[in-house]
Amino acid sequence: MKLRTVAAAMLALALSAGAAAAQPAKSLRDQIVGTWNFVVAEVTAPDGKKSYPFGETPKGILIFTPDGRFAQIHVAGDVPKIASNNRLTGTPEEYAAIMRRSLSVFGTYAVDEEKKTVTYNIVSATFPNWEGEAQTRTIDKLTEDEFVNTNAGIAGGRGSASNFYKRVK
């Protein structure tokens, strides 16, 4: 009797493994949907020098919804607090430091499966010059846990910028 139970269990396992293998691979778009923690942004200058515009310990999040919307917040880990404790009464220096060390953007997105790119159609951003733009990033890595994308042509020919994320679990 035990032998039959073990044999039946092994057969069931083999069949379920075969069924799982027969399922089609998830599209890049399906894989990208979810919530991602921002790990770091790395800018590589044309001479190969690397810099980190949000520092090496930033905070942030990137959210892709199934219906094609995204929201992104990147903040340096060392953004100074406003001394007055009132966001409307900071000094020009405090506001400048915050603007240089943070970025929020939202809109819609599209994934090109063949080119392995994601295009952000920006509705609004804390850098208002981007509003209405479509910005395309190369998907360099996309696993269950990690997502890396690169903007190959950042403003002023300063090189490329890669953003690294880990999936929120």
Predicted regions and their residues:
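Positively charged n-region of N-terminal signal peptides that target proteins for export
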Residues: 1-5
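Lipid interaction determinants
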Residues: 8-10, 18-169
